[in-house]
C-alpha cells in the first residue's frame, strides 16, 4: 500500500470525524482515513515487522455511557499499552452499511474489531475477501481462518445484580428492559432472575423488549411501562442509562448494563455488569504483532477480569453487599455455576436436570425463559 502524505491524511481523517459528528445515529459514515500506512498482515507463524494498523466498528457513540463507551475505553487502554493509534467508526447500523464500512477499513488496516452481534455475517463476508487481515467480532459465533470471536460471561454479573434486586424489592415485582430477544439478552435475563430467586423465591420478573441497542427515548418508555405495572426494581440490557434515570424519577431502584452508571442516579442505583475490554484488546493485537494470533472463540469472565461488577449504589445495605461478595467469590473460584439444575422454564418444562450444569455452548444458544419470568420470546 502506498503511503499518503501526512497533511492529506490528517485532513481526510478530520473530515471523516466531522462527518461522523454531524450525522449522529442516523447513518454510519465512511471509514476514517488511516493515520499511517497499513502494513500487510503477516502469517500467524511470523512476527509482524511493524506495529499493525487497527480499526474498530461501533454500534453507538463512544459517549453512550454504556456498551460502546466501554469498548472505546478498551481501545484507549490498548493504544496506551502498545503505543498504537487506532481508528474507529461510530453509529454503524447492523445493515449493509456495516459491510461497506468494514470493507473500507479492511483495505487500510491489519486488524478490524467489529463490536456488535449484528455485524457477524457482514464481518464474515469481508473476511473472505481479505485473507491477510485479522477480524475479531464481539458476541458472535461464526469464525474463519482469519476471523475470531470474543465475548464474556456477563451473565455471571447479571446473576449478582439479581441478588441485589431480589433483596431490594418491596413487592417482589422486578422489571427487565431487554434490547433484542436474542440469546445474549435471554441468558442475561435468566441469570438476573435466578440470582433474584436465590435470595427471594417469590420474585417475578416482567420483561419488555425494545428492539434497539441504543435509543434512550424508547428505553425510557419501556422502563416507565414496567414501573406502571408495579415493578419497583429494574435492570436494563441496553446501552444507555435511560432506564436508571426513569426509575430514579419514580423513586425506584435500577441498574444498567455494560458500564458503571452510578453517576446518573447514585441513590437509586443497584449495580450491574461491567465490561473490561482493554486487556483482551492488548492480548489480541500483541498476538498479531508476535505472529502467534490464531482464530478462536474467546470467552472471558469474572475470573480473568473481562467481566466485572459495578460499585454498589449509595443505598445498598452492607448485608446485601456481603451476600453478593460471597456469591462473587464462589463464581470466580468455580464453586458456583449460574446455570446449574434443577431449572425449569416459564412454561413448566424442566430444562436443566438436578445437578446438571449447562455448557457454555448451551448457554450461548439459550432460547427459553426461566420460571419466574413473565413474558415471551417474540418469534
Across the structure, where does each feature detected by a protein language model lie?
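C-terminal motif of bacterial Sec signal peptides marking the signal peptidase cleavage site
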Residues: 20-24
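Hydrophobic helical h-region of N-terminal Sec-dependent signal peptides
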Residues: 12-18
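A residue-level marker of the well-folded mature domains of exported/periplasmic proteins
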Residues: 26-379
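Bacterial N-terminal signal peptides that target proteins for export
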Residues: 2-12
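Intrinsic disorder/low-complexity detector
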Residues: 6-8, 19, 374
Amino acid at each position: 500500500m502506498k503511503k499518503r502524505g501526512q497533511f492529506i491524511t490528517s485532513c481526510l481523517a478530520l473530515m471523516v470525524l466531522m462527518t461522523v459528528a454531524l450525522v449522529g445515529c442516523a447513518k454510519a459514515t465512511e471509514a476514517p482515513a488511516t493515520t499511517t500506512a497499513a502494513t500487510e498482515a503477516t502469517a500467524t507463524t511470523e512476527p509482524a515487522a511493524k506495529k499493525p494498523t487497527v480499526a474498530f466498528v461501533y454500534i453507538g457513540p463512544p459517549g453512550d455511557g454504556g456498551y460502546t463507551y466501554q469498548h472505546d475505553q478498551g481501545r484507549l487502554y490498548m493504544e496506551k499499552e502498545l503505543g498504537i493509534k487506532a481508528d474507529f467508526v461510530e453509529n454503524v447500523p447492523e445493515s449493509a452499511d456495516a459491510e461497506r464500512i468494514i470493507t473500507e477499513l479492511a483495505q487500510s488496516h491489519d486488524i478490524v474489531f467489529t463490536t456488535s452481534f449484528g455485524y457477524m455475517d457482514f464481518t464474515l463476508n469481508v473476511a473472505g475477501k481479505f485473507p491477510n487481515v485479522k477480524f475479531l467480532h464481539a458476541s458472535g459465533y461464526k469464525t474463519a481462518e482469519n476471523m475470531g470471536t470474543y465475548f464474556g460471561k456477563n451473565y455471571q454479573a447479571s446473576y449478582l445484580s439479581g441478588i441485589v434486586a431480589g433483596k431490594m424489592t418491596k413487592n417482589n415485582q422486578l422489571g427487565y428492559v431487554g434490547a433484542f430477544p436474542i440469546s445474549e439478552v435471554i441468558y442475561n435475563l435468566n441469570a438476573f432472575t435466578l440470582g433474584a430467586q436465590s435470595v427471594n423465591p417469590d420474585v417475578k420478573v416482567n420483561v419488555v423488549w425494545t428492539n434497539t441497542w441504543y435509543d434512550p427515548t424508547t428505553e425510557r418508555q419501556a422502563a416507565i411501562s414496567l414501573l406502571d405495572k408495579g415493578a419497583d426494581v429494574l435492570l436494563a440490557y441496553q446501552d444507555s442509562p435511560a432506564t436508571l434515570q426513569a426509575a430514579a424519577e419514580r423513586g425506584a431502584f435500577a441498574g444498567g448494563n455494560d458500564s458503571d452508571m452510578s453517576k446518573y442516579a447514585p441513590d437509586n442505583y443497584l449495580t450491574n455488569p461491567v465490561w473490561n475490554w482493554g486487556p483482551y484488546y492488548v492480548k489480541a493485537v500483541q498476538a498479531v504483532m508476535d505472529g502467534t494470533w490464531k482464530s478462536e472463540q474467546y470467552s472471558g469472565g469474572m475470573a480473568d477480569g473481562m467481566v466485572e461488577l459495578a460499585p454498589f449504589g449509595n443505598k445498598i445495605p452492607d448485608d446485601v453487599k456481603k451476600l453478593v461478595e460471597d456469591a462473587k467469590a464462589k463464581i470466580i473460584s468455580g464453586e458456583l455455576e449460574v446455570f446449574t439444575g434443577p431449572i425449569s422454564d416459564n412454561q413448566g418444562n424442566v430444562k436443566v436436570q438436578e445437578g446438571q450444569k449447562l455448557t457454555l455452548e448451551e448457554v450461548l444458544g439459550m432460547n427459553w425463559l426461566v420460571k419466574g419470568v413473565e413474558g415471551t420470546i417474540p418469534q
